[in-house]
């Protein structure tokens, strides 16, 4: 366990340092959140300036937060890991005893910090609009924790065998956009066919957005929030376990560790 903690701390430090050295990476991860929030603020201002009383911002804050988490996790986590494999960095790591779980989790602390910053912004906006009291705040904290854990687990699973950073970035950016539109808030259910609504509600990202909207704006979710939590938790556990088991250090195939070579020659 002591070795596991040392590896985790070392990887976390390296990951944080790399992000500090490449501020454009951090900016790109935050851009999606900032853009979606700015759009919602502009729409709300437009409604209120015309005398309307529709709370578009409160209804879509959950989607804004989920979109920000998708950018940090699906793009900002999976792409750097695949790039490390593509450059051969992971192959070098494979020559020393390093638990996969410690390495993968060590990539997350600095990215979790970005998610927490986005969460703080969402809470400030929601509080300013009078949406928060004790119970919703605690529920949103639970939703954010479980939902972010799910997205990070999926990101690690995607990165576990990815070979091309460019292809991963393009695919994950497209997935992030699609799941935001499939979450239901940006496209009303009334204009979507019933089968499409059912398909969108089957997506774990929709569970995240629905639970967050219920916490932040009191919007009724299509299922009880604890049920949505349970579904997201199951996805997180399954994806993280599979990511650790399938993680490949080498772009040309799984690199053997020194002790594995010794067993082969014995």
Model-identified regions with their sequence ranges:
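Membrane-interfacial helix-loop-helix junctions in multi-pass membrane proteins
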Residues: 18, 134, 183-238
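Hydrophobic alpha-helical transmembrane segments of multi-pass membrane transport/permease proteins
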Residues: 20-47, 57-77, 117, 174-181, ...
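Junction motif at the cytosolic side of a transmembrane helix
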Residues: 128, 216-219, 227-266
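Hydrophobic alpha-helical transmembrane segments of membrane proteins
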Residues: 50-83, 142-156, 160, 243
């Amino acid at each position: 366990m002591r070795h596991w903690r040392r590896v985790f701390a070392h990887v976390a430090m390296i990951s944080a340092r790399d992000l500090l050295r490449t501020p454009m990476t951090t900016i790109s991860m935050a851009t999606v959140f900032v853009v979606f929030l700015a759009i919602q603020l502009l729409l709300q201002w437009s409604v209120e300036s015309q005398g309307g009383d529709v709370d578009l911002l409160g209804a879509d804050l959950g989607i804004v937060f989920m979109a920000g988490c998708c950018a940090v996790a699906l793009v900002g986590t999976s792409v750097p890991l695949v790039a490390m494999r593509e450059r051969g960095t992971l192959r070098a790591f494979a020559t020393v005893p390093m638990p996969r779980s410690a390495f993968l989790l060590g990539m997350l602390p600095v990215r979790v910090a970005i998610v927490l910053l986005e969460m703080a912004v969402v809470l400030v906006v929601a509080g300013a609009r009078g949406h928060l009291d004790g119970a919703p705040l605690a529920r949103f904290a639970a939703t954010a924790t479980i939902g972010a854990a799910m997205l990070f687990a999926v990101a690690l699973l995607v990165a576990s065998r990815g070979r091309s950073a460019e292809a991963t970035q393009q695919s994950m950016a497209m997935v992030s956009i699609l799941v935001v539109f499939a979450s239901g808030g940006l496209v009303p259910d009334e204009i979507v066919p019933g089968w499409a609504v059912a398909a969108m509600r089957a997506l774990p990202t929709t569970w995240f957005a629905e639970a967050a909207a219920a916490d932040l704006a009191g919007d009724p979710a299509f299922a009880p929030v604890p049920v949505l939590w349970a579904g997201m938790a199951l996805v997180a556990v399954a994806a993280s376990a599979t990511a650790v088991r399938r993680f490949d250090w080498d772009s040309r195939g799984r690199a053997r560790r020194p002790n594995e070579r010794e067993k082969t020659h014995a």
